[in-house]
UniProtKB/Swiss-Prot annotation:
<dbReference type="InterPro" id="IPR012340">
    <property type="entry name" value="NA-bd_OB-fold"/>
</dbReference>
<dbReference type="InterPro" id="IPR004365">
    <property type="entry name" value="NA-bd_OB_tRNA"/>
</dbReference>
<keyword id="KW-0963">Cytoplasm</keyword>
<dbReference type="InterPro" id="IPR002313">
    <property type="entry name" value="Lys-tRNA-ligase_II"/>
</dbReference>
<keyword id="KW-0460">Magnesium</keyword>
<feature type="binding site">
    <location>
        <position position="417"/>
    </location>
    <ligand>
        <name>Mg(2+) 2</name>
    </ligand>
</feature>
<keyword id="KW-0479">Metal-binding</keyword>
<keyword id="KW-0648">Protein biosynthesis</keyword>
<dbReference type="InterPro" id="IPR018149">
    <property type="entry name" value="Lys-tRNA-synth_II_C"/>
</dbReference>
<dbReference type="GO" id="GO:0006430">
    <property type="term" value="P:lysyl-tRNA aminoacylation"/>
</dbReference>
<keyword id="KW-0030">Aminoacyl-tRNA synthetase</keyword>
<comment type="subunit">
    <text>Homodimer.</text>
</comment>
<dbReference type="InterPro" id="IPR006195">
    <property type="entry name" value="aa-tRNA-synth_II"/>
</dbReference>
<dbReference type="InterPro" id="IPR004364">
    <property type="entry name" value="Aa-tRNA-synt_II"/>
</dbReference>
<dbReference type="GO" id="GO:0000287">
    <property type="term" value="F:magnesium ion binding"/>
</dbReference>
<dbReference type="InterPro" id="IPR045864">
    <property type="entry name" value="aa-tRNA-synth_II/BPL/LPL"/>
</dbReference>
<dbReference type="GO" id="GO:0005524">
    <property type="term" value="F:ATP binding"/>
</dbReference>
Length: 500
């Protein structure tokens, strides 16, 4: 009977038996005083050796007798040789019965897949061309008490992979590569901005007023101060306070928290880049964003063509720039300018499209609802969607030519919002009025409307220079660059319901 035919109880019993056997082996090691030593220091990594000596022949390696010390987890044990894995990759280690003591040879026979060992020896190459370490000494560093998933079927259950990411990382090289890329992307973003004189800062994660975005916050209680507080939904208002204070180019890469739905594109805890630069506008940020995205694609993929599922996104071409209003007309030719400019018609169109219309929305809000329902998912290639109505952009500067819209863009790729940016509103009186309008919307039933932040208005009253700001979703960006279908694939420990 295959393991796929066994019921869960039988599988659990089998695992318990294996765990018991491994615990017996650990107990024997403890009795000898050999459990969990911490005095080994490696001098080489597995994949570094593979790269460094790729051109060395069997004869050259034999003559050079290069000594190495490696360590890693046993992923394959054939008796005469083992394959170990460290953070860089894998290498074979050869069990030489002529050079290893009998006691060591006996211990090696008791080792299991998943055990972590330390090996010393010299590099050699097999007749098949594989690089390996001919061991002169080897010992157990850590006994693995739980068996790894079956090598033929692996860890394939998606929910189990998310819950036990540590096992997922051990057995799935592509998962390890995804998170290497994530680290690489964040490091490059830092370098990209610092080269342009941006200062990295940290702003509060606990806030008395949740601001900077339209979202539901997580609430908590500060016992020492006896006050309600919120996990931040965005760092924006604090970063702009820093611009007021004289830090004219700032950025932060950190987590935001929004008490909202979970999907393949949404996680309540997610990572954002936000950056602000004085004496710039939203069009400057478009140019900067295109440059950054092209560099990241080239870094990760070696090309500005980004494959995702059955599509290819072209980062090397100029990103399309289109207003909210014009995009609705372009992708819905049955609609007219008159339809979108009549509030009753716009409300009917939004309702028919499936938007949750509450009845108090203005024309601009309704236009955005129509855009979200009828256009957003159609924006496959990179699109900068501009000129968002001021009703839905309470922190953005009004457009000089049309005060009903703002100098704002959102970047969409693959039908998903990746970035949001605008020329910042620095008129304190206008900001106060917009906060008041947001409070009225909240009182009317809009849970995502913003609170009034009197201290932020006060900061603007000291004067903020003309500024452009932007937020980029790191998780969604990494999804694109790693061809990952779900946001949970690029978050190490995504939130899950407790197991029954």
């Amino acid at each position: 009977m295959s393991d796929q035919q066994l019921d869960p109880q039988a599988l659990q019993q089998e695992e318990n038996t294996l765990i018991a056997l491994r615990k017996e082996k650990l107990a024997a090691g403890r009795a000898k005083g050999q459990a969990f030593p911490n005095d080994f220091r490696r001098d080489s990594y597995c994949n570094d050796l593979q790269k460094q000596y790729v051109d060395k022949t069997k004869e050259e390696l034999a003559e050079a007798a290069i000594p190495v010390k490696v360590a890693g987890r046993i992923m394959l044990n054939r008796g005469s040789f083992m394959v170990i894995q460290d953070m860089t990759g894998r290498i074979q280690v050869y069990v030489n019965r002529k050079t290893l003591p009998e006691e060591t040879l006996a211990e090696v026979k008791t080792w299991d897949l998943g055990d972590i060992i330390a090996a010393e020896g010299t590099l050699a190459r097999s007749g098949k061309g594989d690089l390996y370490v001919e061991m002169t000494s080897v010992r157990l560093l850590t006994k693995s008490l739980r068996p790894l998933p079956d090598k033929h079927h692996g860890l394939t259950d998606t929910e189990q992979r998310y819950r036990q990411r540590y096992v997922d990382l051990i057995v799935n090289e592509e998962v390890r590569e995804t998170f290497r890329v994530r680290s690489q992307v964040i490091a490059h973003i830092r370098s990209f901005l610092m080269k342009r004189d941006f200062l990295e800062v940290e702003t509060p994660m606990l806030q008395t007023i949740p601001g900077g975005a339209a979202a539901k916050p997580f609430e908590t209680h500060h016992n020492a101060l006896d006050m309600e507080m919120f996990l931040r939904i965005a760092p924006e208002l604090y970063l702009k306070r820093l611009v007021v204070g004289g830090f004219e180019k700032v950025f932060e890469i950190n987590r935001n928290f929004r008490n909202e739905g979970v999907s393949t594109r949404h996680n309540p805890e997610f990572t954002m880049l936000e950056f602000y630069q004085a004496y710039a506008d939203y069009e400057d940020n478009m140019d900067l964003t295109e440059e950054l995205f092209r560099e990241l694609a080239q870094l990760v993929l070696g090309s500005t063509d980004v494959p995702y599922g059955d599509k290819v996104f072209h980062f090397g071409e100029p990103f399309v720039r289109l207003s909210v209003f014009d995009s609705i007309l372009k992708y819905n030719p049955e609609l007219t300018v008159a339809d979108l400019q009549d509030i009753d018609k716009a409300r009917a169109i939004a309702k028919k499209a499936g938007a949750k219309v509450l009845g108090f929305e203005g024309l601009g809000k309704l236009q955005v609802m129509i855009f979200e329902e009828l256009v957003e998912h159609k924006l496959e290639q990179p699109h900068f969607i501009t000129q968002y109505p001021f009703e839905v952009s309470p922190l953005a500067r009004r457009n000089d030519e049309n005060p009903n819209v703002t100098d704002r863009f959102e970047l969409f790729i693959g039908g998903r919002e990746i970035a949001n940016a605008y020329s910042e509103l620095n008129d304190a009186e206008d900001q106060a009025e917009r906060f008041q309008a947001q409070v009225a919307d909240k009182d009317a039933g809009d849970d995502e409307a913003m609170h009034y932040d009197a201290d932020f208005v006060r900061a603007l009253e000291y004067g903020m220079p003309p500024t452009a700001g932007e937020g980029i979703g790191i998780d969604r960006l990494v999804m694109l660059l790693t061809d990952s279908p779900s946001i949970r694939d690029v978050i190490l420990f995504p939130h899950m319901r407790p197991q029954a």
